[in-house]
């Protein structure tokens, strides 16, 4: 009788663990999706920084590239509005 009780208890523990693992994987997938959404979201920058970017493009385009390289980006360009844009 003890053997059957132990076996039943072990079965319950394994099933609960499997359910918890499944829920953890689902939560991890949801978190990954949310992080990808946030990664793709546009980030608003302060007006002062935008003003600095415009001045960078109006003075010299190479300063825009230097600015972006220092931030870790590979390429840079100046938009029609003279705003420096950094691109991977």
UniProtKB/Swiss-Prot annotation:
S-S bridge residues: 57-78, 64-84, 68-86
One record GO biological process: defense response to bacterium
Domain of life: Eukaryota
Propeptide residues according to the Swiss-Prot or TrEMBL record: 25-54
Tissue occurrence: Hemocytes and fat body.
Protein's UniProt keywords contain Secreted: yes
Family: Belongs to the invertebrate defensin family. Type 1 subfamily.
Role according to the record: Sapecins, which are potent bactericidal proteins, are produced in response to injury. Sapecin B is cytotoxic to Gram-positive bacteria.
Protein name stated in the entry: Sapecin-B
Species annotation: Sarcophaga peregrina
